[in-house]
């Protein structure tokens, strides 16, 4: 199993979002001109570098697909993804997670494993119900 380093994560996000992420030190924050995305790096437990992403929903759907591709290529290091329909998606990355746990807003277990199709199915389900909120956790 190969884990993505922070520099690799930054490059992948730049490719996905089409933005140059200059700051990557702990505590720094990147905000784009249109407030479409906020990227903030911090220490998860004083040893794990974690990046937090908050962005609008349509951009979040692109991130979901990117995460599925990362899973299929064994870049498995996502800690959790929170998707709020038509509002925001929160994506948490860290360098020490692998298995995927999917719960709905009420904490009901939907899926556990590391299958990329699970994320794509969640993506499809989000289109059906504007009130759906999912939390996806790895680790």
Question: Which stretches of residues belong to each language-model region?
Answer:
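Phosphoinositide-dependent membrane-docking surfaces
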Residues: 12-22, 88-89
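Acidic, low-complexity, intrinsically disordered interaction modules
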Residues: 23-127
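Short, mixed-charge low-complexity intrinsically disordered segments
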Residues: 127-139
